[in-house]
Amino acid sequence: MVRNAERRTLLADAAVRVLAQQGSRGLTHRAIDAEAKAPRGTASNYFASRDEIIDAILLRISERLQPDPDIHADLAQRPPGVELFNEYLRDIVHRLTDNRDAAIALFELRLEATRRPRVAEALTTWRRAGLQADI
């Protein structure tokens, strides 16, 4: 099977949906294959381990929740204050509600991070990168 970026993205999106719908215990290669309507074994060809699945999910969540640069450029031109703060919050809520599966999957990862140090480490790295991008 030829690996390609588009299929990897489709599988990562399927993994996000599986995690959001079934929780951490339901996140398996087979469940991802089924959700993506891909032949059995496809997800394991792209993601050799659960850690690789988690990394792909975090990358995909990051891409899906990325702020619109035009909106943020507009907000950056406004004077600081309560209204600006409210606009930033509205933008965050809008992105989370438009990407419900990604938001729920992120909560699932936060729960799993309390039990699995590798997930906690990946989530911390992801959050720090997001913070640096915001600064």
Language-model region placement:
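Hydrophobic alpha-helical connector segments
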Residues: 56, 69-102
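N-terminal intrinsically disordered/low-complexity leader segments
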Residues: 1-6
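Helix-turn-helix
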Residues: 10, 14-56
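Short, basic, alpha-helical segments at the C-terminal edge of helix-turn-helix-like DNA-binding modules
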Residues: 59-66
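Solvent-exposed, amphipathic alpha-helical segments
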Residues: 10, 14-22, 67-71, 105, ...
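Amphipathic alpha-helical packing segments from all-alpha helical-bundle domains
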Residues: 66, 97-107, 114-135
